[in-house]
Amino acid sequence: MEKKDMLYEGKAKKIFRTDDKDTVVVYYKDDATAFNGEKKGTIEDKGVMNNSITAMLFELLEKKGVKTHFIEKINEREQLCKKVEIVPLEVIVRNIAAGSMAKRLGLSEGRKLDTTVFEISYKNDDLNDPLINDYHAVAIGLTTFEELKEMYSIAEKVNNTLKEFFDEQGINLVDFKIEIGRFNGELLLADEISPDTCRLWDKSTGEKLDKDRFRRDMGNVKEAYMEILKRVNK
């Protein structure tokens, strides 16, 4: 496998072509952003930690029957992945009220929800990734009802697997977001699963071990990511 020119650079990762049209190299950066890029910073070694955390969690999910774009970890910052066409939606899964949902609905942060909540947002930076419903997504040509049904099924499997896994590590999986990609007629879990994309709270202390520490200027951001890596790597 030979790494070639850069295809795309996002907020947290760079994507490179390879000599195989069906694969890409994903490079994890140390850049941190919040509030749709309004807040910017750097977290030392974030890319190294998120690459490792994502690789381990994707391997776990593959073993549990969730198909992903992940092929292998190449080095401390890069992984080889299938070249998917990303569906321009984020699926957000919420087990405990926090963040924008708590604010939007006037709920106290930390309230356990009576059922898991599934939301979708339209991946569009210019519009600040607005929440939409299934009908919007289909009406504006982003996806189909059949594809959405499968996306929610993938999200539910990911939630069930990771909730149980993190619980064993003494962590509450509060909420998370995933992206899905199309590859040879299949839908695959793509992007990453890390403290950048999940809210992870210590079960005994309630301490936040995720990007909220950066968003809210709580300090000890690197230490929180290191703690998640340590627990995932047990």
Curated annotation (Swiss-Prot):
HAMAP family in the cross-refs: SAICAR_synth (MF_00137)
Origin: domain of life: Bacteria
List the top taxonomic levels of the source: Bacteria, Bacillati, Bacillota, Clostridia, Eubacteriales
UniProt catalytic activity: 5-amino-1-(5-phospho-D-ribosyl)imidazole-4-carboxylate + L-aspartate + ATP = (2S)-2-[5-amino-1-(5-phospho-beta-D-ribosyl)imidazole-4-carboxamido]succinate + ADP + phosphate + 2 H(+)
Which residues are listed as membrane-spanning? none
Question: Pfam family example for this protein?
Answer: SAICAR_synt
| NCBIfam families named in the record | purC (TIGR00081)
GO term, biological process aspect, one: 'de novo' IMP biosynthetic process
Q: What is this protein called?
A: Phosphoribosylaminoimidazole-succinocarboxamide synthase
**Which protein family is it in?**
Belongs to the SAICAR synthetase family.
Task: Keywords in alphabetical order, please.
Answer: ATP-binding, Ligase, Nucleotide-binding, Purine biosynthesis
* Annotated EC: 6.3.2.6
- What pathway is this protein said to act in by its record? Purine metabolism; IMP biosynthesis via de novo pathway; 5-amino-1-(5-phospho-D-ribosyl)imidazole-4-carboxamide from 5-amino-1-(5-phospho-D-ribosyl)imidazole-4-carboxylate: step 1/2
Broadest EC class assigned to this enzyme: ligase
Q: Which InterPro entries match?
A: SAICAR_synt/ADE2_N, SAICAR_synt_PurC, SAICAR_synth, SAICAR_synthetase, SAICAR_synthetase_CS
Q: What GO MF annotations does this protein's record show? A: ATP binding; phosphoribosylaminoimidazolesuccinocarboxamide synthase activity
